[in-house]
Design a protein with these regions (language model features):
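Hydrophobic anchor at the beta1->P-loop junction of P-loop NTPases
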Residues: 53-55
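Walker A (P-loop) phosphate-binding loop of P-loop NTPases
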Residues: 60
Length: 237
């Protein structure tokens, strides 16, 4: 028998800055608790102000390092940050692997930062099916920015574009990411393209190829946002 949940008290505690209340609310979301509808209704009046940034890219391109760097930059501006790192599900428990949280441990004791790993649980799209509700929890809890790091990128893994206010696509030279991005339709969903590990050979060629492919796309009309392609080497940050 599930324990009864005092939803109004839990939401009020989360809005007051209690990380335990935020964790409890996200757990209710992930577990599909019977009180989930009541939770979402209670959060609704307090959500809608957070800016959501999605980070996606193939495994090994440096998503977690980039997320951590963005987190630090936003904290320097005094912003309250939430991070949802969607990990591949454990084949045994269905729970999230905690590698991302280990890499972000420098911010773990910051009261203005909330970091949560979420299991994809086999859901395609690079996200967990509960990610939208978890974003609403962090939004209502007062986060100014929510960073969402996806499992990866592929033909089916473009959900982040419909969920985030801005989507950052990370690529690396020498991994064939530019060609794969074109095949997967990622060029249509990215707001910013970052060629990470730009100290490697082939970075300039990757940037050039991406800019060329974007110029051939459908976002070249006047007034439309044309995604920039930038180089980044986080080893220097």
């Amino acid at each position: 028998m599930r324990r009864a949940v005092d939803v109004p008290a839990l939401v009020e505690s989360a809005r007051a800055g209690s990380p335990r209340a935020v964790a409890r609310l996200i757990s209710l979301v992930e577990d599909g608790h019977p009180a989930l509808r009541e939770v979402m209704a209670a959060l609704a009046p307090h959500s809608g102000s957070a800016y959501v940034i999605g980070l996606t890219g193939s495994p090994g391109v440096g998503k977690s390092t980039s997320t951590t760097a963005l987190l630090g930059a936003f904290r320097e501006r005094g912003l309250r940050i939430g991070v949802l790192a969607v990990d591949p599900s454990s084949p045994f428990s269905g729970g999230a692997l905690l590698g991302d949280r280990v890499r972000m441990q420098d911010h773990a004791l910051d009261p203005e930062v909330y970091i949560r790993s979420m299991a994809s649980r086999g859901h395609l799209g690079g996200l967990s099916w509960t990610t939208p509700q978890a974003i609403r929890v962090l939004d209502a809890a007062g986060c100014d920015v929510v960073l969402v790091e996806t499992v990866g990128v592929g033909q089916s893994e473009v959900e982040i574009a419909g969920l985030a206010d801005s989507s950052v696509v990370l690529l690396a030279p020498g991994m064939g990411d530019g060609i794969q991005a074109a095949k997967a339709g990622i060029l249509e969903i990215g707001d910013v393209f970052v060629v990470n590990k730009s100290d490697r050979d082939g970075a300039d060629a990757t940037v050039r190829d991406l800019r060329h492919m974007i110029s051939l796309g459908d976002r070249t009309e006047p007034g439309l946002w044309r995604p920039p392609v930038v180089k980044l080497s986080l080893i220097h940050i």
